[in-house]
C-alpha cells in the first residue's frame, strides 16, 4: 500500500490535505474502480455463481458504473449544500478527486467479504458486517474530505453529511415507504 493511501485511511487530515493540493483525478478514479470493483466482484460472484463469466463481469461493470455516477452526483450535492450554506472556500474538483479515495475502505474490507462468502450462509453476516463497516468508514472519510476541502470544522462537515443523507432519505426512501404503507392499508 502506498504511503499516500495509508495516510488517507489512517491519518486522514494530513493525507487529504496533501492530495487536495495536487490534482489526482485519474488516481482517484483508479482507486474507486479497484475498491468498488473488487468488493462488488467478491459479493456478486458468490450470488451469480451459476451464471456465465460474461454475465458476472457485466454485473460488476454495471455496479461500478452506477456507483461512480451516484458518488459523483452525491459529491456535487454536498458541494451545492456547502455553497448554499456559505462555505465558499471549497473546490468542487478537489472534492471529486477525494471521493475516489473515500471508497478505499471497501478495498480493505474485500478480504473479509471473501472470507464471508467462503463460510456459506453464516458468512453472510460477515459480508453484511464488512459492508456496514466499510460504509461507516467511508462516511467518516467523506466528513474528513469536506473538512479539508472546504476549510470547515468537523461538526459542520458532520452536519452537512447528515443533512444530505436526510435529503436523500426524504427524496428516495420516504415516498416508497408511504406507498408501501398505503398498499398495506388497502390490502389489510
Where are these predicted regions, by residue range?
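Selected alpha-helical membrane-embedding segments in polytopic membrane proteins
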Residues: 1-93
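Short, surface-exposed, polar/charged, turn-prone segments marking secondary-structure boundaries
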Residues: 22, 111-112, 185-188
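Juxtamembrane "helix-exit" motif on the non-cytosolic side of transmembrane helices
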Residues: 44-52, 113-120, 179
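Hydrophobic core of alpha-helical transmembrane segments in multi-pass integral membrane proteins
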Residues: 36-42, 168-175
